[in-house]
Amino acid sequence: GPGINERRYTDTPISFSDLLPTISDIAGNKILKRKDLDGGSFKKLLFNKSDKVFRKTKGLIFHVPYENKIALERAHSAIIVDNYKLIKFYDNNDTNLYDLKNDISESIDLSKIYINEKLTKKLEKILDNYLEEVKAPKWQPGITWKENPLKIINSFH
């Protein structure tokens, strides 16, 4: 589009939740000031004014509170901050930490290495606090979340 450099590349992660704030920002609306939006505008990223997306939460957070055939086949939540991605599985409470800059395939779990234990705990705390703040649905064995409304299940962080 106009004002966007041709063939521009960035490794700054964005997510679907960033689209509404970005479109709104480009259109000149003030929706960005709403506190109930998870995403942030990447308008400045598009127009080479910044290499970051500013969100109310630190990093990108993903939450899959049910078993499925697509997302790792296990209930989990994940957070990406800077180069690191932490995944927390709910069926056995495993936590994995990956350095996305040096291990894009997420094949080397760094969470159990002594030097990374502090970072693992820090990211897990940020993730847990966010899930609690938004009252995210909580996984329970045998629940698919597709057959019953969340109000009936009544299981939240």
Segments (PLM) and residue ranges:
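Intrinsically disordered, low-complexity polar regions and short flexible loop motifs
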Residues: 103
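Long, internal low-complexity/basic segments
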Residues: 19, 93, 107-157
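C-terminal cap/loop subdomain of S1 sulfatases and analogous C-terminal strand-loop tails that border
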Residues: 3-8, 12, 17-100, 151-155
